[in-house]
A protein has these predicted regions:
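Extended assembly-interface regions of large multimeric machines
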Residues: 1-229, 234, 241-244, 258-336
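Short amphipathic beta-strand/extended segments with alternating polar/hydrophobic composition
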Residues: 96-97, 109-115, 142-150, 196-200, ...
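Extended N-terminal export/anchoring regions of large proteins
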Residues: 172, 284, 290-402
Length: 763
């Protein structure tokens, strides 16, 4: 070891000779693609249990028998595995949204499949054109969700008897009122003179009567006022904040200031428009009057909408500390998300999320690395919506100088020196989210294209499964076909697509079920008739006959009958999720090289009965055609009674346990082989590799996975030509353990005087 010291010293080096071992792998992750009512689209999402499935992708639905997909996934999860679920796309699948005018957007205008898609579309850094809020992902699930947004548009509401004919004429004008008050200090008092300056941020035709205790809409008006500053008698202007019960607030009465009487309305050129004087009948806190709609209805009909006061759930929005430090104002806003129709939580009016203290400033943060910018915060933290951009009708809430309105007031820009415009209180309802539109007839054929369907086309399902083709992107051990509610040819096409993905990966098994029509005849009125066993046998054999021959596929014999607790009904569900689940359970209780079939390990969960319980002769026909029968066995229940793969020729790999043994060995040893990359192909490296692999194989042999093995990794297969090509070769010979499929029991009767030695071997 070179020390590389020019003067006396000590060099410490550490050598790790423990590197290199074969780590066992576990095959418990499935992959499934299907139509769901909600959730990210075309993004494999890890689901650990049924509750995760429910929260992420919604409940099973009877429309287009979508429950088949959902219950296949649920069945697999019941055996202890995890599932990467992909929600299939559709050309008519759209997000619900609200456009910037506060009206629902057309569904065709927007599709955001997932957070990743949101970022790919550039919305992480840019606003969404014409959209204020959008549902987190496509579908009608979001329709009826209410969104409340509030900022500090105003401080006070002044009830007045006179307003301009066009209410918008005064918005942005200034208001003043004389002040004569004493401010307490430390050991002294300060005389406050001059006038209070504010800006009109809203004018409406509703207000309070002269008595001040009755809300009316007759010849009355309301001015919404934002307090800006105090101007002293010496004309020194000082920014101030509104004080609900203090000095800095506008009051009723006829107090005077130099040249003015009562509250004055000033143009942006500084000219007096009018003196309101005694016509100001009331002065109320603006924030205390703001309401949040909590249930869906017609905003124009008060009796149809439930409300709560904003002040009961959030603090008054003002200016964030981040903005204050940068000379900005009025950036704070709150966002509340409410289940307006009870579709999400089950209770209309439930507050789903409350996001407070957010900022309109694009660079705003609560702390380093924790954005408070409203759009980025919602992207990172909301389960229901994305922020699109500021609503239209942003009102100026400050002056740039004197009485000149602030012009640089837009949301979604950096905070430095900006007086952000205000929108006040916004009550939105998300609508126009669209589901799949490809409805099916009772017999599985494509029906009339209408809204509200829950069937994805085979091409879209295939696109979803292609996401699993690259084994480096997503680790899956089982690919589930899911729903078989397709016509025969479409189901065969989908099955071949799933098998093709497994063949490409070489590390996963595809589990296939026959099409629904092979077993069941559905009617337009919802009744179901089970076909005869003879018809089913012919249908099942005919379905599998043209499917690709592959040892990476497993074929089952049908459907089970199970209870759907979400709809309080029994459903017919394909068995592909159960067969994959049996493999998971076998991994957990035994090892991958044990067969998942039989009474010991092949019990099907959550099954009341089968649509098809094949007889012995029918099982013979199925098994010779690569199909694994699932049967009812008295005393044992419903069990898997076969362990063949979909390989169409005689081979060790025509059995599930052998195929899974080799997948286990290949995955584990290939992972260990990565440590040999970029090493020298010499005797030391080769010996090290053999010493890594042999103990692993010896352990598998001790656990009954293989009967014998040999590892060849020396100069006989690593020739000079191999070495010169920068290659490394190891040949591993395996004698796999075989599962018992056929048992022969012979009972021989002999005469009393016959010795057994005379007849043993002769019968």
């Amino acid at each position: 070891m070179p020390i590389n010291l020019a003067s006396p010293g000590i060099v410490v080096k550490e050598v790790d000779l423990t590197v290199g071992r074969v780590d066992p792998t576990s095959g418990t992750v499935g992959g499934l693609v299907g139509p769901f009512t909600k959730g990210p689209v075309e993004l494999p999402t890890v689901i650990a249990n049924e509750n995760d499935l429910l929260n992420t992708f919604g409940k099973p639905n009877s429309i287009d028998k979508q429950y088949e997909t959902w219950l296949v996934a649920s069945s697999f999860l019941a055996y202890g595995g995890a599932l990467r679920v992909v929600r299939a796309d559709d050309d008519n699948l759209y997000n619900g949204a609200v456009n910037t005018s506060g009206v629902s957007t057309t569904a065709a205008a927007l599709k955001i499949k997932s957070v990743e898609h949101y970022e790919q579309l550039g919305y992480d850094d840019n606003t969404i054109s014409n959209i204020t809020v959008a549902a987190r992902n496509p579908g009608s699930w979001s329709n009826g969700i209410r969104i409340g947004i509030i900022d500090g548009k105003a401080d006070q509401c002044l009830g007045v008897s006179s307003i301009p004919a066009t209410t918008s004429d005064w918005v942005g004008y200034g208001v003043t009122q004389a002040i004569s008050a004493t401010l307490p200090g430390v050991g002294s008092t300060t005389l406050l003179d001059g006038y209070l300056k504010g800006i009109i941020t809203g004018v409406s035709t509703t207000g309070y009567s002269a008595a001040g205790d009755k809300y009316t809409t007759v010849q009355e008006g309301t001015l919404e006022i934002k307090v800006i500053s105090h101007v002293s008698a010496g004309n020194t202007e000082t920014p101030v904040e509104y004080q609900p019960n203090g000095v800095y607030r506008f009051t009723t009465g006829t107090a005077t200031t130099t040249g003015h009487n009562g509250i004055q309305v000033m143009t942006n050129a500084g000219a007096t428009v009018t003196s309101l004087g005694s016509t100001v009948h009331s002065s109320e806190d603006w924030f205390d009057k703001q309401v949040l709609y909590t249930s869906s209805g017609n905003p124009g009909v008060a009796s149809t909408i439930s409300t709560i006061q904003w002040s009961s759930i959030v603090d008054r929005p003002t200016t964030t500390e981040f903005a204050t430090d940068r000379g900005a104002k009025n950036d704070e806003l709150h966002v509340v998300i409410i289940d307006g129709e009870g579709k999400v939580s089950g209770n209309a009016g439930t507050i789903l999320e409350r996001h407070t203290g957010l900022s309109k400033a694009k660079d705003a943060e609560f702390s380093a690395g924790s954005p408070s910018y409203w759009r980025k915060y919602l992207k990172n933290n909301s389960s229901y919506i994305f922020g699109g951009g500021a609503p239209i009708g942003i009102t100026t809430s400050g002056f740039s100088s004197g009485w000149t309105k602030q012009t640089d007031q837009a949301w979604d820009q950096d905070a430095d020196g900006i007086i952000f415009g205000s929108s006040g209180t916004k009550n939105y309802k998300i609508v126009n989210g669209e589901d799949y539109k490809r409805n099916l007839n009772a017999d599985g054929t494509v029906g009339v294209i209408t809204t509200g369907g829950l069937t994805a086309s085979v091409s879209k399902l295939a696109t979803g499964y292609k996401l699993f083709e690259n084994a480096d992107n997503y680790a899956v051990d089982f690919l589930l076909m899911g729903s078989a509610n397709h016509v025969k040819t479409e189901a065969q096409s989908l099955a071949n697509q799933v098998i093709a993905v497994a063949d490409i990966r070489k590390d996963a098994l595809a589990f296939i079920s026959p099409y629904r029509g092979a077993f069941l005849t559905d009617t337009s009125v919802g009744s179901v008739t089970v076909n005869s066993d003879e018809t089913i046998t012919n249908n099942v054999v005919g379905f599998y006959s043209p499917l690709t021959s592959s040892s990476y596929a497993v074929f089952d014999s049908g459907y089970k009958y199970m209870f759907d607790r979400f709809d309080n009904a029994f459903r017919y569900v394909p068995l592909n999720g159960d067969l994959a689940g049996l493999c998971v359970r076998t991994d957990i209780t035994n090892f991958p090289w044990f067969s998942p079939a039989g009474t010991a390990r092949g019990a099907i969960l959550n099954a009341v009965k089968l649509t098809y319980n094949p007889s012995k002769s029918q099982r013979d026909l199925l098994y010779t055609n690569r199909i694994n029968p699932v049967i009812f066995s008295p005393g044992s229940g419903i069990i898997l009674f076969g362990d063949k793969t979909g390989l169409g020729r005689s081979s060790a790999f025509d059995r599930i346990n052998v195929r899974r043994l080799f997948l286990y060995l290949e995955n584990a040893i290939s992972a260990a082989a990565k440590d040999q990359l970029f090493e020298f192909n010499d005797e030391i490296t080769r010996t090290n590799f053999v010493n890594i692999v042999e103990p692993f194989l010896r352990d598998v042999q001790a656990k009954r996975g293989i009967t014998d093995y040999v590892v060849i990794c020396d100069e006989t297969n690593n020739t000079a030509a191999v070495i010169d090509n920068n290659e490394f070769v190891a040949d591993i010979f395996i004698k796999p353990a075989r599962s018992i499929n056929f048992i022969g029991l012979t009972f021989v009767a002999t005469r009393t005087g016959v010795a057994f030695e005379e007849v043993i071997g002769n019968v």
